[in-house]
């Protein structure tokens, strides 16, 4: 797994306010844990710890929402 911003299918981050929301989202996707990274590169977004390689992550380029 890797530590990364989990992405929606369109390469968009999951915006957040609470750590609990991100922890639920990340663990449902197989990560060890997750939290809401405030004021990060893509604003307030969910960041997952040890997320499985099969789960998409935010990469360079635009978010096509």
Curated annotation (Swiss-Prot):
Cited CDD domains: neurotoxins_LC_scorpion
Domain LCN-type CS-alpha/beta residue range list: 2-64
Keywords on record: Amidation, Disulfide bond, Ion channel impairing toxin, Neurotoxin, Secreted, Toxin, Voltage-gated sodium channel impairing toxin
Matching Gene3D superfamilies: Knottin, scorpion toxin-like
InterPro entries recorded: LCN-type_CS_alpha_beta_dom, Scorpion_toxin-like, Scorpion_toxin-like_sf, Scorpion_toxinL, Scorpion_toxinL/defensin
Tissue-specificity statement: Expressed by the venom gland.
Superkingdom of the organism of origin: Eukaryota
Compartments in which it is found: Secreted
BP-aspect Gene Ontology terms: defense response
Modified residues (Phenylalanine amide): 65
GO cellular component, one term: extracellular region
Similarity annotation: Belongs to the long (4 C-C) scorpion toxin superfamily. Sodium channel inhibitor family. Alpha subfamily.
Domain statement: Has the structural arrangement of an alpha-helix connected to antiparallel beta-sheets by disulfide bonds (CS-alpha/beta).
The protein's name: Neurotoxin Bot2
């Amino acid at each position: 797994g890797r530590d990364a911003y989990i992405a929606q299918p369109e390469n968009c981050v999951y915006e957040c306010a609470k750590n609990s929301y991100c922890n639920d989202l990340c663990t449902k996707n197989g990560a060890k844990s997750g939290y809401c990274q405030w004021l990060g590169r893509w604003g307030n977004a969910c960041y997952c710890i040890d997320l499985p390689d099969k789960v998409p992550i935010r990469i360079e380029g635009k978010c096509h929402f």
